[in-house]
Amino acid sequence: MKKFLLTLLTAVAVTVHAADITGAGATFPYPVYAKWAEAYKKETGIGLNYQSIGSSGGIRQINNKTVTFGATDAPVSGENLDKMSQVQFPAIIGGTVPVVNLDGFKPGELRITGPVMAEVFMGSISKWNDPKLVALNPGKRLPDQPITVVHRADGSGTTFNWTDYLTTVSKEWADRVGRGAAVKWPASTSV
């Protein structure tokens, strides 16, 4: 009997040990998770397969129990965690910044405030030489060219973080658009 139990436990342990860990969600942490997965497999022999499909997709998959863990850049409410019998904890911390491609400006050289950024994303500031941008960049020559606003098209934790910030710095943004993983962008090009 003892030999049978030991054999059974060994078989279960080998089966459990052979199972890969699966995860899905936010694109932001993928490079870090890939490095961690490589180190974890080397140390334990257990694979970690992470699908970088966006925060909303990760939440859907963990809620549907098709993955071992989900990842999102946006916090999940306590109510939803309780409903799904889940826990959350921070794994990686990062920031979101606007990217500007404007001739004559080096990275970090263009000055812009949160409220003005909200106006750009709402479409009320639509040209680089808008007086509000000119006032923030004295001595710089801003072109009379349209601003093309680009954002993610899918549900995204990065979108949540960005719109959360714009909601904090602009009452008009808060009233018209608000915060969320997916919002109706007033001025945009989806990617």
Predicted regions and their residues:
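Positively charged n-region of N-terminal signal peptides that target proteins for export
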Residues: M1-F4
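Flexible loop/hinge segments at secondary-structure junctions
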Residues: A18-V191
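Hydrophobic h-region of N-terminal signal peptides that target proteins for export
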Residues: L6-A18
